[in-house]
């Protein structure tokens, strides 16, 4: 279904492939224009002057300290992962702990729950940035530019209809190999900034991105010792309209 990639040679941990019912990944892994789009990932730019999003390990890196498989077998697996946010010549601003739960209730669907607790090790200032938090980059076959559909909980579609809009979830799907498949990202109602506005692109990128629309229009400021808990659900699925009803229902129960 998916691999969770942990390597000191990578910018941050990420998921790839993220296989749909066709057995091909619904996400893409970097390209010439956007080499920092690593499939399905979590990061942030402009954190106390560091960049924990774009290429260049010297600019900032999210490094795995520990990863444990808590549960494995049948249709369910659970991983716990601790990470530190580091860059040369600066104190680490953040450490985080992730709990990743993957379930496969049917051959046409799997669910990935990504729960992250971020602890501020310093006073943290995040400058306004469109590079923030949980994000997905779809395979070009499924992008709006190639006939795919991006739709939010309110039924608004495409980059024009969804960019900057607050919505509980977003689904991205398209036709491939004779069928329709896609991936939805759902924000948990307990999340700070819920529902965060979305940064969306018809070429395949989508992310609930609160740091691009900060309340003071300049920065997101967190104090040393602050704890930020965020939860996201990813549903990789066949179909579209029927699945969107299922996604809407799932947004209330995880």
Feature map (PLM): residue ranges:
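Beta-strand-rich N-terminal accessory domains
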Residues: 1-35, 241, 247
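Acidic (Asp/Glu-rich), glycine- and aromatic
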Residues: 4-19, 105-150
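A short, structured loop/turn motif at beta-sheet edges
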Residues: 68-77, 104-108, 175-180, 190-194, ...
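Extended, loop-rich substrate-binding clefts of extracytoplasmic carbohydrate-active enzymes
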Residues: 38-108
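Beta-strand elements of well-folded, non-transmembrane domains
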Residues: 22, 83-87, 100-104, 118-122, ...
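Active-site/ligand-binding surface loops and adjacent short beta/alpha elements
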Residues: 123-195
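Beta-strand-rich recognition/accessory modules
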Residues: 185-254
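Hydrophobic residues positioned within well-ordered beta-strands of beta-sheet architectures
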Residues: 79-81, 96-98, 112-114, 134, ...
